[in-house]
Amino acid sequence: MFEPTAIYAPNPHRYDTMTYNRAGTSGLKLPAVSLGFWHNFGDITPFDQMKSLVFTAFDNGITHFDLANNYGPEPGQAEKNCGLLLAKYFKHHRDELVISTKAGYEMWTGPYGDLGSRKYLLASLDQSLERLGLDYVDIFYHHRMDPNTPLEETMGALATAVQSGKAIYAGLSNYNGETLEKATAILNELHVPFVL
C-alpha cells in the first residue's frame, strides 16, 4: 500500500519559534504544543489529511506526538496510522520526535483488557509498539487510575517497561493529586525516569 520511505523535506527553520519546556524535573524537553492523535487519525480520516496534519505540526516545531492504545476509531487505529506515517516519512527524523502512548482503557474483551494490571500494561505496550512499528516509545503512560490493582503493581509494570528499553520515561494520566503523590514516590524509589 505504501512504499517504505518517501521524500519529505521538513521546514529547516522548524525549531526557530517553538518554545520547549522541561517535562517535570527530567531532562526531556517538550514543545509548548503537542499533536494529539485522539481525533483525526482513525480509520475514517483520509490518509492525506493525516499526513497534512503531521507535516504542518512538525514543520512548526511540534515534535511530541501523543497517542493511546485505544485511540481510533477503531481502537488501535491511530497507532497504526502513526506507524505508517513514521515509516513512510519520518524514518530519518525519529530522534527528533517524542512519541508517547498510553494504556488503561478497555482494549480487548475479557478480564485482562483494561485498567492497571501488570499483565495488561505490558501486553498493551508490546501491541502498541507493533502497531507503531517502533522498538520503543519515549513516554509510556498509565492512562487512568485503577482502584482495584495495587499501585505498586502498576508502577512496577511501568518500571519494567522502562528497564526493558521499551520506554524511556514513565508517565501518569488522569490521576488525582493524592494518588499521583503516592505513585511518584514509588517510581522514585524504583529509580524510574518519570516525566508527568
Predicted regions, residues:
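Structural preference for beta-strand elements that scaffold enzyme active sites
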Residues: R22, L30-S34, T63-H64, E96-K102, ...
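Short, acidic/polar
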Residues: I44-F58, D114-G133, E153, L180-A185
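Active-site beta-loop-alpha junctions enriched in small/polar residues
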Residues: W38-N40, A68-N70, K102-E106, H142-M145, ...
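Active-site groove signature of glycoside hydrolases
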Residues: L129-T149
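A structural motif corresponding to the C-terminal end of an alpha-helix
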Residues: N60, K91, E130-Y136, A161-K166
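Beta/alpha (TIM)-barrel catalytic core signal, keyed to glycine-rich beta->alpha loops juxtaposed to Asp/Glu
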Residues: F2-T17, M145-L196
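Active-site mouth loops of central-metabolism enzymes
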Residues: G36-D48, E106-L122, H143-T149
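N-terminal binding-site loop/beta-alpha segment at the start of enzyme catalytic domains
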Residues: M1-L97, Q163
